[in-house]
Regions:
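A short alpha-helical element within helix-turn-helix/winged-helix DNA-binding domains
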Residues: 1, 123-133, 149
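Short, cationic-aromatic polyanion-contact patches
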Residues: 1-26, 110-111, 127, 154, ...
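Amphipathic alpha-helical dimerization/coiled-coil segments
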Residues: 8-59, 63-68, 177-204
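Short, Lys/Arg-enriched N-terminal segment that forms or immediately precedes the first helix
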Residues: 61-72, 95-100
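Structural motif
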Residues: 71-79
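Short helix->loop/beta-hairpin flanking segments within DNA-binding domains
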Residues: 82-124
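Short amphipathic alpha-helical interaction segments
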Residues: 136-151
Length: 204
């Protein structure tokens, strides 16, 4: 028997919010191209998602589920991927900061983006306690996952017991391939969503 109260816990309210923001940002990037037309604002996107939820969410799951499976296959489990992801986001922040200040010698492009993220020099890493706080994964589990990642030569530990990315290693090549593959799938997802909103019979 289904408990109706449980439905409230299944509502993807935060995901709809984040997805709407993401689609809006991509819409702004494409605005100005003759073939794209007007950009779409966040509230417009949210209304569309909620009105045609089953259509949009089916398309989202076709993106999200294979995405998670690819990372699980690479990292053995999703918790390890999340731990690694916190370190990667820290590097991504430093790369963005340096790029904004025009301190990057080689232009950051679609094809060299992941390599640039791993190679960027960071002043500080991120420690196990911070990763546990951010991810809500128990600290003992985080430490165990970090040890595996260090052993796999994907990350390294500095003298302050903080973790940073490494730019070499067989596993990094696999992660880089996943990154490129993911970008193609994201592009296909966005193409379908924009097509739904601009060219289909689905109207708000």
């Amino acid at each position: 028997i289904f408990n109706k109260k449980g439905i409230n816990f299944q509502k993807p309210t935060k995901t709809v919010e984040l997805l709407s923001t993401f689609i809006e940002k991509k819409s702004k990037m494409l605005f100005g191209n003759d073939w794209f037309g007007d950009n779409l604002d966040k509230e417009q996107i949210k209304k569309f998602i909620m009105k045609y939820f089953t259509h949009v969410w089916l398309r989202f799951f076709k993106l999200q589920i294979p995405f998670l499976i690819r990372h699980r296959n690479t990292f053995n489990d999703l918790e390890t991927w999340i731990v690694w992801g916190n370190i990667a986001i820290s590097h991504q922040y430093y790369l963005h900061k340096l790029n904004t200040q025009n301190l990057i010698k080689e232009p950051v492009t679609f094809t060299n983006y992941y390599e640039s993220v791993t190679a960027v020099k960071v002043n500080r890493g991120i420690n196990a306690s911070s990763i546990a706080d951010i991810s809500s994964i128990p600290r003992a589990t985080v430490i165990r996952k970090l040890k595996w990642l260090v052993k796999s030569s994907v990350i390294k530990k500095n003298k302050n017991l903080e973790y940073q990315m490494r730019s070499s290693g067989k596993m990094n090549k696999e992660i880089g391939k996943n990154f490129m593959l993911n970008q193609n799938y994201v592009a296909e997802f966005l193409t379908d969503i924009f097509d739904y909103m601009k060219n289909s019979n689905f109207k708000i």
